[in-house]
A protein has these predicted regions:
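Polybasic "coupling" helices that flank or enter modular domains
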Residues: 106-107, 124-192
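Glycine- and acidic-residue-biased ligand/ion/polar-headgroup-sensing regions
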Residues: 54-67, 83-84
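A cytosolic small-molecule/anion-sensing beta-strand core signal
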Residues: 41, 60-61, 82, 107
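Phosphate-/nucleic-acid-contacting segments
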Residues: 165-229
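Cyclic-nucleotide recognition modules
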Residues: 77-135
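Short phosphate-coordinating micro-motif centered on Lys-Gly-acidic
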Residues: 39-51
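Short, small/polar residue-rich loop motifs at catalytic or cofactor-binding pockets
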Residues: 32-33, 51-53
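Cyclic nucleotide-binding regulatory module and flanking cytosolic helices
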Residues: 1-41, 81, 86-87, 91-94
Length: 229
């Protein structure tokens, strides 16, 4: 159980709440609670892909494994999410209010959850929160637009690194994608042989690691840097 002082310090550091005055934040907290819940490491997802998104969920501390399985079932991605952050705030509203990924606590984690109704009735009344929320949604939209850029005219290497960057737009550390070589070649519109050769070259440069039907990128930041050279 954390003290009120510790709780206030925690709230002021959370995305979307930064910049809200102490008085306004104290009022919001007194109305909707914003209790900190702790969860130990788990072997199964705490939140599963396609679960309804009914709350705004702040991951305040700790790390979670984030996993996604494509709709066609041909590939799966895996990355690490580090608090403080928010779990898919863009899926709280819209036509399909469901989580796109599964989330499994990798270590002790803590959460603050706010019901959608309380977001609308209380948090949205704070101008700073609205500005922060709209800015976050805009950033997500811009990243998704970048993912849709055509890949025609690119080399095989550029197609592979571009695909990885589109899949892991908000990641800087280690990520993984489980996919068969043939399926990857089809995704980028190349032959299996050219795809395999290029992956081996990237591995020789220590940009990726290859295992059976698995590509590991130890550092996404390094891959982005090499892609710009």
């Amino acid at each position: 159980m954390i003290s009120l002082t510790q709780k206030y310090e925690l709230l002021t550091k959370l995305p979307l709440l930064q910049g809200i005055s102490g008085k306004e934040l104290a009022h919001i907290e007194s109305v909707i609670g914003m209790e900190v819940n702790e969860v130990p490491p788990m072997s199964r997802p705490l939140i599963r892909q396609n679960d309804p998104c009914t709350h705004l969920i702040f991951l305040t501390t700790g790390k979670m494994i984030r996993q996604y399985k494509s709709d066609d079932g041909l590939y799966q991605t895996k990355s690490i999410l580090q608090g403080p952050t928010i779990l898919e705030p863009h899926n709280l509203y819209g036509l399909n209010c469901r989580f796109r990924c599964s989330y499994t606590p990798l270590q002790d984690v803590s959460f603050i959850t706010v019901r959608k109704r309380d977001v609308m009735q209380h948090l949205m009344k704070a101008e700073i929160f609205r500005i922060n929320y709209f800015n976050m949604l805009s950033a997500i939209i811009h990243k998704k637009e970048a993912q849709l850029q055509p890949v025609q005219g690119l080399t095989v290497r550029q197609k592979i690194t571009s695909l990885l960057q589109r899949l892991f737009t908000d990641c800087s550390g280690q990520v993984e994608i489980a996919i068969k070589m043939t399926d990857l070649a089809n995704y980028i519109g190349e032959t299996r042989l050219n795809t395999s050769r290029t992956l081996n070259q990237l591995e020789e440069e220590n940009i990726i690691e290859l295992k059976r039907s698995l590509i590991i990128v130890p550092e996404m930041d390094k891959l982005r840097m090499k892609s710009e050279e």
